[in-house]
């Protein structure tokens, strides 16, 4: 069949089919086209209004920018691991060569890193000295927080031997082939360090000896033992809880990808324990409002504001082309941006009953709209709850609503109606009589004890239902309906009623507001479904560890009539009358689940874990301060918290700052919180708790109290036999081998030194004691020490540096003043003598011998003179290393509840 030919349209046909009207034809049209053009303009205006309403009604991300940043940082904090994977032991000991072929020196490299030089000015401020202690404890924790994996080995005579670079000792000195005399003993010792292949808890590991300081080894041993022996129970408990969490939140959680957790070739490392302890989150001082804001960000879903069926308005209050009823005038308006902000406040308060309350914003006299006030008075009663268990408005809000609600009942003119006022003069104390019918408006008066006059009247608004969190069992049931029973509009039916609705319809009908009564009746189903969605959001999406505990929630309702405000709130938001009208007409409909509901358990656990770390640091630091009060004479109660607070992670610190924005946190609040025994277990806490054991021996963190002033001449040795002098590896140090005998030691405590300094006789007193050859101990305070290893004689300021500062201050009057500061860092130095073969015998003799004024005692000195037989004596620890065929997997990324693609990440 041939293709038909295209017909050419005439000009008249083109005009008739044109989607737009042409200007000259409109001008010449007798009227029909003009009417169509006008109708198009009307439709365009209507569509613009609908588009504006839709844009305003689209709900944006409810998270404020600062809260959004906090939770983003918390999520990144989740990726931080409290451990690191090492193949070999870090180098803790190194060797310094000497001119001797038999002796050399072993230096504790870890002590060098810990005992770094500090500023003198920081020691007199207790908070800064506490910060120094915390930093050194953290350095021990970081040094010991490692797991060994795939240790390097080799075979000697069929035995598996650990490589020399995996021992924790830099053996390049004593085991070097250049030292022909001593290389053989050191090499033989290393060849005896056999690796044992073991099976611990169905995990393949290698056990071998190594060198490590005691404080660091304790942390490493505790971390390794926990990963090997205890992680599977933690994993099982976390999986069971996450399964229950997913079922409650109506999200799918699949652990099909984690089925090999009990495999001998896989080790899962769980840095954080799930779930978080809610009591720990709620014992933070004044945390009610910050937790409320955080909970809002975690659980409020994205949604939109929709209008009910337009036929409801058209067949009730807007059935005529022109109408003058108050409802018809207001329900046809478009909300402004400011009014939509108030609508969001209203729905936010409905999602957080008792915690967020609404108050009517006062308006200037020239802006008062009596019609809006009267309509808001009626609709506000249908929208808000005012007892007995739920409150959405403040005690001051019912006053304006009650004053204006009767206007709607009195404005409608009616011949056969009588209004009889009561004796009290209250706004609702009147009776409407119509024939034999009568309605007492006192039924609509508020009563917080029973909820009269508002949506919570005569309904069971709070039920009991178990949740994944033990501190929350309440189930909010606005209007008395279980949300799951009525939320599906297709099957819930049309007979959903509640007491206030029936009473309000009766009041509107008897007062002559028949159209308004019909509107409220037709809106009943939409209203019930509105609250069903809100109840579901509260009971499902908003339930978290940050939810207000049941007893505190009930306490807010109990103290509500007294208009009391406490640390838990309530938070008051102001709204306008027009916002109430628009909130009743617009229904909040969730369109997507909250984004953070998937990793909410991990965020809660991360936050609780770092709170526990802060408590651990503060409590242990306070114990250290109490045990060494001589070093912290001017310490104040909150100095420990001031030292710990700056070391908190940034997002945790920001949440604490949110607390200070709403309520003043006192020292008593902080003290009560720190004394609480509640903690959230984690690998961070395990390592930190073990690291704090180092302060039992202050030398482990580079502190000592055995500091003495004593004249110790630096010897000048005659070089009669240069070869023997070199062979002996002669050295000088101000570190004593033992404490001075009691008969040769004098202690000058702080009180004695202050007394003699005030009299201007401190130097004289110390000089007399030094002339007698005594060791003068300057107090019993702990002082930080640092290690120096100069290649030649230390400078004069190091040799003569005193552990205290005593100087006269400028005189501004007849009284002399002195400054006495007891705490100064002490240098522990070590100097090796080197002799040239062509040196004269008196090469090292000085006519005026140098003096070292300060001596100190360290139980385990950081430097020792050793031989080839004793060089490796520090290799006395047994280490466990995971074999290369074992996979180390971190579980932090796999604890995103509801994500079927949450895979454990490689820990290497």
From Swiss-Prot:
MF terms in GO: structural molecule activity
Signal peptide: none
Coiled coil regions in record: none
Chain residue ranges for the region called Disordered: 1-25
Primary localization: virion
Similarity section: Belongs to the orbivirus VP3 family.
Protein's name according to its UniProt entry: Structural core protein VP2
Organism in which the protein naturally occurs: Broadhaven virus (BRD)
Classification lineage: Viruses, Riboviria, Orthornavirae, Duplornaviricota, Resentoviricetes
Gene name tied to this protein: Segment-2
